[in-house]
Amino acid sequence: MKMRLILLSTLFAVSAGAMAQGSLADYNRAYSLSNKFNNDNVYNLPADIKFKDSTNTYYYTENTAAGKKYVAKNADTNGSKSFDSKEELYKYLDIKLPEAAKPQFGRKHERHWMEIDEEKDTHPVTSPDGKLEAYIEGENVVLHEVGKPYTEKRILSTDGTLSNYYSAWIQWSPDSKYIMTCKRRPVEKRYVYYVESSPADQLQPILHKQEYAKPGDELPFKVPCIFDVTTGKEVIASTQLFDNQFSLDAFTWSSDSKEVIFEYNERGHKIYRVLTMSAQTGKVRTIIEETAATFVNYPRHFRYDFADTSKMIWMSECDNWNHLYMYNVAKGKVINQITKGTWCVREIVKVDEKANAIYFSASGVNPNEDPYHIHYYRIGMDGKNMICLTPAEGNHQAVFNYDMKYVVDKYSKADTPPVTELRSGIDGKMISTIAKADISKLKECGWVAPEIFKAKGRDGVTDIWGIIQRPTNFDPTKKYPVIEYIYAGPGDAYTPKSFIAYNWNTTALAELGFIVVQMDGMGTAWRGKKFEELCYKNLKDAGFPDRELWIKAAAAKYPYIDANNVGIFGASAGGQESTTAVLLHGDFYKAAYSSCGCQDNRMDKIWWNELWMGYPVDKSYEECSNVVNAHKLQGALMLVVGELDDNVDPSSTFQVANALEKAGKDFELVVLPGVHHTMGEKFGEHKRFDFFVKNLLKVTPPKWNEITK
């Protein structure tokens, strides 16, 4: 009898513990957190830090126990003034208050980011000496003397047609003797159509049409040409070095007006060239050529042309790490590698020709620190005397004054509040501590920091870094299902590295009774090109072997983590990846919420997918398609799509739904009227919460209208 009572009480305790997660109280708490966990409850945290132009005075806003303050400080004297309003601050600084943003009514007259500029503007372009104007009229180049009637014009070309016309992107040489443009061959465009079912200003639906090139589509072709404005002579470039274009751009005249420098990105992204064309002969030669068996990561490139255009700084991953190189333009050869090592340059802040120095940010320099933490550096152009200007451990954000003498450095970690310091922009020496963030009020509200966690990846050597978010009422005696937030790109690293008072992807969801995690597996950026190019023609990988090992390692350390009960969610590329999780890794991931996913890379935008999946479109696209793999679904799946998604074609989601239905698979489909590219907005968040509570906690969620939101 005694044993039976013990057994019954144990079962009751387990049942009560399970029911405690996903309850109405949990929902109410989850929805309340964004109002409590925010920067209003963080004191001494400078925001919107700026230096006044051409001065050593910097200014910022911060919350204090007495309310919001607007502060101006002099870096030379450390003198400080505090104000109660932005108007008072700007009056003291004698700078104009920024104008309020004008309301936007609709998008009808804006160029959509997917639209290709046809380069047909008819506005005249004036020569540097102010004497002549060049413009396009009837697909041809026309010259006009400033001050004279436009009826008095000189036609420089006559062979322009609708199918092969001269571009209006005209550039004058510095000496005003030449003009450069391109002959442009347009192509037939692809369009995506979608219906706005519930427009705000009318009853009937609206059909939208959007230009949208997809992988494999034909692209425009451009050929540079240069006109001598004195003789009217035209020279046209030979296309041999740029005959398979994805893009041809970044045209710049040399300072001596003898050449035009431009960049060629080959279709398929395995060759990238910086070229130059002679104004006299039209001859094209190569300054820089990058090649890769996988892809040249062109969005990461940086080019700096020296004032006399004799030298050029170029950023490249040619040695596996993202670094800077000095090139001799005339010889087309590397003078020296400026930065080197098993770390990555992240961004160029300034190239100072006068000081012969470069200011930049980088990650991975410090071997004993999180390799994603960003620090700021100064280095000589000869690659010597590299100095860290922001040495404290953490992820840094730096603001420099006009002459780089001072840097305001704010740094933090995902689990550590920010510190803001004033340092020397010359040697990084500490000048003063501006502020140390006070999060005591945040903690009084129950705030719980995420844990930074690392585990070995699939190779058994490489550390995979991520975060673990626990609920505010965390109880280590309970068992917690795991939910992973995924966005694996590629193209960047996505796990937060700086302090965040409220993480929209993890905080509220954890409060329902979950452990929520995020990590960057192989195939993402800033750990070297070999680490990233695992994604090539293989987006279905998405780092899943590393992710599973990471979660299992966390569960091995923390017994309350249930690695046998794992869900996953994401949007956009993360929507594709979360769907892939339950199609190809359904033995590990039991439930997936997938919003606005590019579920088949053949359906998505051309630039993103051809960069990672290559060109021409081949079998790898099919192998990575969630439409093709839909019949492999295991576990629960919720598909979410905004009917007006102008980033990822909504049909991508509908085609997965169609394939799942034909395969006899059960799933949920949520269509959001009037919504663009999204994680789901308020209704989607509600559906996501309920979906995981039902499928991982195995309890019935409270009614939505009973929750205090």
Question: What are these regions, as identified by a protein language model?
Answer:
Residues S34-K68, E119-T126:
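Beta-strand-rich domains and repeat architectures in extracellular enzymes and scaffolds
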Residues M1-D26:
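Bacterial Sec-dependent N-terminal signal peptides
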Residues S257, E263, N395-K709:
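Serine-hydrolase catalytic core recognition
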